[in-house]
């Protein structure tokens, strides 16, 4: 009769032999099928039939619009990804038989996940905050509050905090202190303001006084083109005495016409023709016999 320890050892050897017979090791690019190691299909292809004792694994290339990125034994390839424009996506890299389509976001947006399934608008840094890191295709803008001595007065996707203006460097004084959103306001010192204001005021007063004198002079100056009345134009410097029998008629001009004196009435012009004047001149120059 077999003892119990021997029986246990016998069953252990039997189970070990059975287990070793079924434990077949395949390589990284193989898979176990019906006790045999079959080759996996390479990237860009799919499985059509498993291997047998007489034939190797049968694979077929992926169709257009499909891909397989790894060594596989799948009977179907994967569809290329579609970049949906309504979600703000665009194609960054076209897909191939071995790789999927790569999508990214449009300008001004970034992916909300690692797979870039959706997009979101870049977040601008509000006034009082500056840009620490600008947004990218996969990350949003990183903002930080402006420290003391710096400011940001606008919402921006790229502006950093700017330092306050140094009034001392410009020989000015601080009129208003700066904040995280506003710059320092500089101005002239009190003494300098007085030195500048006094000459300006004096210049304005002198200009006004000069204009006043000029207007006054122009108003008092008589007009050159003023027309005197007829009585003033005809008045002689000295009054003429009236004598009895004084003839005030204008002098009468006499001319010769055909060796006879001709009296020309006042206010009338001489009407002697050129031919008559030549005859008169020839008679006057003829010597007497």
From Swiss-Prot:
PROSITE patterns: TNFR_NGFR_1, TNFR_NGFR_2. Disulfide bonds join 26-37, 38-51, 41-59, 62-77, 83-103, 105-119, 111-116, 125-143. One of its GO terms (molecular function) is signaling receptor activity. One of its GO terms (cellular component) is CD40 receptor complex. The chain crosses the membrane at residues 194-215. InterPro entries: TNFR/NGFR_Cys_rich_reg (IPR001368), TNFR_5 (IPR020435), TNFRSF5 (IPR052135), TNFRSF5_N (IPR034021). It comes from the Eukaryota. Residues 1-19 form the signal peptide. Keywords: Cell membrane, Disulfide bond, Glycoprotein, Immunity, Membrane, Receptor, Repeat, Secreted, Signal, Transmembrane, Transmembrane helix. Glycans are attached at residue 153. Residues 216-289 are cytoplasmic. Residues 228-251 are annotated as: Disordered. GO terms for biological process: B cell activation; B cell mediated immunity; B cell proliferation; CD40 signaling pathway; cell surface receptor signaling pathway via JAK-STAT; cellular response to mechanical stimulus; defense response to protozoan; defense response to virus. Residues 20-193 are extracellular. TNFR-Cys repeats lie at residues 25-60, 61-103, 104-144, 145-187. Monomer and homodimer. Interacts with TRAF1, TRAF2 and TRAF6. Interacts with TRAF3 and TRAF5. Interacts with TRAF6 and MAP3K8; the interaction is required for ERK activation. Receptor for TNFSF5/CD40LG. Transduces TRAF6- and MAP3K8-mediated signals that activate ERK in macrophages and B cells, leading to induction of immunoglobulin secretion. This is Tumor necrosis factor receptor superfamily member 5. It comes from Mus musculus. The lineage of its organism: Eukaryota, Metazoa, Chordata, Craniata, Vertebrata. The gene is Cd40.
